[in-house]
Structures are given as structure tokens and as C-alpha cells.
């Protein structure tokens, strides 16, 4: 969480921070995308992060809606975005990772990486649906030299091993004991 915004960490000094470099980069990038006429989905696994982003968007006068597990009337939020009332939809992984059709979106921003790479890959599918007539651009915001970078490395390593096992190539796959251990180990425990 500290990579997303220090205010998410349960340390008093961190909560006194007014913003983060990542949040500033996000708002700058989002402003550019909206200036290009983009309609944007923003995914985060942290509802508190979405609340911070929402507060700043409101302060900047950017109309948006937010969907988290606590949201009521989910369909009204979706309709608001799909009907063009707002151009930004903030969505938590758990509340919006599946079951939404948001074909008005042409841009997806992953504010933070997820341990579950499959869920992260499904998020852009909210925009890639039957009825989508435009290309969908997917952007990932990651803090260099941080735990986020390590998470991405672990995701890639597991994906490569899975591709080797279940990929399109025909033939016998030979795995070393370390490969099997790496494939089966939880991401958090991999070294």
C-alpha cells in the first residue's frame, strides 16, 4: 500500500503526507487522457486508495463514479458511465473485476499491481466486450525499485512457467525440481 500512497499505511507520520508522487503522476496522466477525449476505467485493489483518488478528482472538478464492495445501486453507477454522464470510473478489484460491461471505456489504468495476475488480466475485459468499437489502451502505474516491481517479476516468472506447461507448443516439457517448486509456490513466498 505504501507504493500507492503513504496515507494508506497505518503510521501517523505517513498519514500526514498530503499526496504521493504516484498520485501526482496519475492525475497528470489522467488529465492528458481526458484532454484527448478518453473514457477511463481506473482499477485498484484498495478501496481506501480509490477514496483518496476520488477526493482529489472532486477537488479538481473531474466528474467520476466509484464502485467498491460498499457501493449500492451498482447498475446506476454503470449507467452513469455508459451514458456519458462521467468519463472516469474508479473500480475496486473485488467489486468490478468480473460481471461488468463498460464498452464506452477506451482506456484502462491499473493503479497498482495485483498478486493475482489472472484477475488483473480480466479487468480490461470490462471494456473489451461485444459492442466495443474502439481500441482499448491499458496502462499500468508501477513504482520502480519497489515491491510492486518485485510483484511484476514474480507474475512474469509464473506466467512463463505456466506457458511452458500449458502453452501452444507441442512436445514434452521437462521441468527441473526448482521449476516445479517455483510454479507451485505462493507468490508471497517466492524468493
List the model feature ranges, each with a label.
Residues 1-89, 93-100, 170-171, 177-191:
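Conserved Helicase C-terminal RecA-like lobe
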Amino acid at each position: 500500500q505504501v507504493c500507492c500512497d503513504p496515507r494508506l499505511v497505518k503510521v501517523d507520520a505517513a498519514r500526514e503526507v498530503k499526496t504521493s508522487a504516484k498520485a501526482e503522476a496519475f492525475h497528470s496522466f489522467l488529465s492528458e487522457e481526458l484532454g484527448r477525449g478518453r473514457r477511463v476505467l481506473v482499477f485498484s485493489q484498495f478501496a481506501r486508495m480509490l477514496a483518496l483518488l476520488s477526493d482529489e478528482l472532486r477537488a479538481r472538478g473531474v466528474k467520476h463514479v466509484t464502485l467498491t464492495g460498499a457501493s449500492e445501486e451498482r447498475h446506476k453507477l454503470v449507467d452513469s458511465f455508459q451514458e456519458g454522464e462521467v468519463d472516469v470510473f474508479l473500480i475496486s478489484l473485488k467489486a468490478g473485476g468480473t460481471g461488468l460491461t463498460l464498452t464506452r471505456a477506451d482506456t484502462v489504468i491499473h493503479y497498482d499491481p495485483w498478486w493475482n495476475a489472472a484477475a488483473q488480466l480480466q479487468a480490461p475485459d470490462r471494456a473489451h466486450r461485444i459492442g466495443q468499437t474502439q481500441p482499448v489502451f491499458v496502462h499500468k502505474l508501477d513504482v520502480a525499485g519497489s515491491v510492486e516491481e518485485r510483484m511484476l517479476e514474480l507474475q512474469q516468472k509464473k506466467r512463463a512457467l505456466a506457458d511452458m506447461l500449458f502453452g501452444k507448443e507441442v512436445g514434452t516439457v521437462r521441468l527441473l525440481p526448482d521449476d516445479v517448486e517455483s510454479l507451485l509456490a505462493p507468490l508471497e513466498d517466492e524468493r
